[in-house]
């Protein structure tokens, strides 16, 4: 889940966004349809990356040949492919999209493909920014009044305390650029709100964040428990990718269960169905707020380029919003913000820079 995306005014010459047209459960048809919506409804400039023989007829059917150029890529990542795809699929649509970003032809990449495959391919081909140990997958939870950013949501199953400190700065930069939060509050996800709670990783990361909060210009608020993820107590929640992904899936499952129970209760009797008529608008707004189709997706932070990973089940609306999110981050110069933020906090042991690529 993540926060609804709103459009910023496009510049005179919108940045080009490369869209992986072969990634996702409903590729390429829904990807093409979403790209068309992004171009026509939001004025974005996109290029589809994938097998031209499959994409050209779909683009022609949308009468969008002049609006959506196609960059041919021979291969596509399967949804089950993980980290090894970065080496096995050198000619995949994700790899070609990363090449466009690296060359400066495109400003960002959007993909609904396998998260593991996209993360590993982007990390290998774009490389991390100077001083960044590992990229982190960041998404936003639909809290009020402002969204809460959760990272890492699955890019790194294992992490070191120094990595979590960097994740805090990556998330803070995203909060400022993507959501207009001037002074993001940062917390670390653990098993108790009191100082000193949690495993060695959480405790050491909290110590580092507390000790350097003033010098690093970071508003660290301490520990956050799982039941407070949606409470809006902080703007950025930091954890390792294993814990973050479990927390995310737990929240998604709980929300799905709650909506199923609400639906069952509202249709349990004629009187209940009648009462639903008076709550239809509020229920629709609530569902939209938690529906991944109305959100942009997760952002892979810390690379030499902007990468947005949409939900694998995204249809046209979800893809359009992912493209809009990528556009807004490029316009907000998210990469430069992260580069400046990390430059002042890269006080980490040199051996950490030799950590292996993200796990599957």
Swiss-Prot record:
Its EC number is 2.3.1.274. This is Phosphate acyltransferase. GO terms for molecular function: phosphate:acyl-[acyl carrier protein] acyltransferase activity. Belongs to the PlsX family. It comes from Thermobifida fusca (strain YX). It catalyses: a fatty acyl-[ACP] + phosphate = an acyl phosphate + holo-[ACP]. GO terms for cellular component: cytoplasm. It is found in: Cytoplasm. Catalyzes the reversible formation of acyl-phosphate (acyl-PO(4)) from acyl-[acyl-carrier-protein] (acyl-ACP). This enzyme utilizes acyl-ACP as fatty acyl donor, but not acyl-CoA.
């Amino acid at each position: 889940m993540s926060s609804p995306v709103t459009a910023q005014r496009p510049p005179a010459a919108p940045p080009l966004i490369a869209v992986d047209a072969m990634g996702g459960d409903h590729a390429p048809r829904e990807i093409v349809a979403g790209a068309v919506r992004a171009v026509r409804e939001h004025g974005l400039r996109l290029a589809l990356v994938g097998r031209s023989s499959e994409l050209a007829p779909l683009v022609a059917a949308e009468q969008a040949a002049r609006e959506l150029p196609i960059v041919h890529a021979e291969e596509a990542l399967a949804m089950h492919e993980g980290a090894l795809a970065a080496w096995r699929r050198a000619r995949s649509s994700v790899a070609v999209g990363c090449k466009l970003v690296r060359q400066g032809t495109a400003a960002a990449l959007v993909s609904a493909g396998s998260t593991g495959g996209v993360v590993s391919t982007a990390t290998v081909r774009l490389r991390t920014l100077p001083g960044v140990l590992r990229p982190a997958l960041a998404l936003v939870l639909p809290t009020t009044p402002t969204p809460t950013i959760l990272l890492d949501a699955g890019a790194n199953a294992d992490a070191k305390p120094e990595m979590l400190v960097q994740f805090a700065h990556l998330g803070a930069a995203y909060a400022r650029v993507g959501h207009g939060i001037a002074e993001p509050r940062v917390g670390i996800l653990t098993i108790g709100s009191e100082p000193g709670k949690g495993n060695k990783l959480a405790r050491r990361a909290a110590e580092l964040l507390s000790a350097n909060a003033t010098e690093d210009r970071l508003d660290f608020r301490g520990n956050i428990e799982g039941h407070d993820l949606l409470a809006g107590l902080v703007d950025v929640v930091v954890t390792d990718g294993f814990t973050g992904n479990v927390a995310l899936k737990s929240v998604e499952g709980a929300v799905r269960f709650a909506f199923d129970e609400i639906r069952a209760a509202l249709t349990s009797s004629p009187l209940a169905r009648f009462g639903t008529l008076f709550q239809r608008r509020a229920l629709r707004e609530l569902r939209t707020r938690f529906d991944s189709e109305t959100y942009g997706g997760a952002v892979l932070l810390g690379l030499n380029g902007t990468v947005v990973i949409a939900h694998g089940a995204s249809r046209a609306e979800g893809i359009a919003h992912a493209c809009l999110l990528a556009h807004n981050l490029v316009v907000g110069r998210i990469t430069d913000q992260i580069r400046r933020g990390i430059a002042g906090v890269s006080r980490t042991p040199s051996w950490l820079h030799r950590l292996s690529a993200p796990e599957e």
